[in-house]
Amino acid sequence: MASYTLAELAARVGGQVDGDGKLRLEGIAPLEEATAAEISFFSNRKYRKAFEASRAGAVVVEPGEKVPAGRPVLRVVNAYLAFAKISTLFHPPREAMPEVAPTAVIHPTARVHPSAQVMPLACVGPDAQVGARTILFPGVHVADGARVGEDCVLYHNVVVRERCAVGNRVILQPGCVVGSDGFGFAFDPDGEGKGPRHYKVPQVGNVVIEDDVEVGANTCVDRATLGSTRIGRGAKIDNLVQIAHNVQVGPLSLLVSQVGVAGSTKLGMGVVAGGQAGIVGHLEIGDGVRIGAQSGVMADVEAGETVSGSPAVPHGNWLKAMASLDHLHDMRKELRELRREVERLRADAGEDEP
């Protein structure tokens, strides 16, 4: 089991030790569960009581944070980022064990790097490529002509369909499908004499996933009708997300669970969409846009804007509208009373109704 002194951890994350730098730590754990041999982290004031009561041997905190007397801490500008890096030290990513399981199916024309690991019942199709140190878990299917880069991890039952391209250091969580057919149909009122029908539009494009992307479990990224659906460098996509045909997701974007992005919409760099947000097709969403959970985006959004609600509006307007909801009943009563008063005054003055 790996262990590090507090000083060693500080050197790894660019932090400063307050307390015993020789303290040896053997793991990382939540504040409530950490023991004297483990390090934890504190970056959210909601957990102040847990921080003060914690039995952790040391805690990662940000500069200027008040700490209980005698507690060793590692001070660093971004405590959450430092936590992530320290956690990686104690729990390093799995490395490929260069082998192809006897029950894996590798087509003779496929090219699998000798350092890659292909587990039981994984399948690599004709002319497909799998890069160095990449791991294919059981049930993965890399289809005809698809390419998977170096240092990737494709978990159980991931599908990368024909001619799709996956970059380097990409993680695809279980059940993720890359390159499923886009939802494209043309209505045919005659149906070649057989009556009305929806005629399937061939989805002949592909999906390109750039480097350092992670795609969550059971997420679907549809292939383009023509051209490419693209997920930009460093984007992170949560579980159960739907990316439609020809969508362009900008670099470093974050799409939270159950987001849906309709066809041909373009998301700029660093867009963040909260859970269950829906974005209609053929829109332009600018760089750095923030979209609130359960929002329905139905128009282009300028770079840097934050929108909420359905239909989505600037977040400040949405907050005002939500604040008004609690008063609607009273306002309705007041309006009814005002109307009655106006009617009475008109009657007293002998005026007719307008």
Curated annotation (Swiss-Prot):
Catalysed reactions listed for this entry: a UDP-3-O-[(3R)-3-hydroxyacyl]-alpha-D-glucosamine + a (3R)-hydroxyacyl-[ACP] = a UDP-2-N,3-O-bis[(3R)-3-hydroxyacyl]-alpha-D-glucosamine + holo-[ACP] + H(+)
SUPFAM superfamilies for the chain: Trimeric LpxA-like enzymes
Keyword Transferase: yes
Keyword line: Acyltransferase, Lipid A biosynthesis, Lipid biosynthesis, Lipid metabolism, Repeat, Transferase
EC category name: transferase
GO biological process: lipid A biosynthetic process
Catalytic machinery residues: H245
EC numbers for this chain: 2.3.1.191
Pathways involved: Bacterial outer membrane biogenesis; LPS lipid A biosynthesis
GO molecular function, one term: N-acyltransferase activity
GO cellular component terms, A-Z: membrane
Keyword Lipid metabolism found: yes
Pfam families noted in UniProt: Hexapep, LpxD
Coiled coil: none
Family in the record: Belongs to the transferase hexapeptide repeat family. LpxD subfamily.
Quaternary structure note: Homotrimer.
Function as written in the Swiss-Prot or TrEMBL entry: Catalyzes the N-acylation of UDP-3-O-acylglucosamine using 3-hydroxyacyl-ACP as the acyl donor. Is involved in the biosynthesis of lipid A, a phosphorylated glycolipid that anchors the lipopolysaccharide to the outer membrane of the cell.
Name assigned to this protein: UDP-3-O-acylglucosamine N-acyltransferase
Species in which this protein is naturally found: Anaeromyxobacter dehalogenans (strain 2CP-C)
Higher taxonomy: Bacteria, Pseudomonadati, Myxococcota, Myxococcia, Myxococcales
Gene (UniProt): lpxD
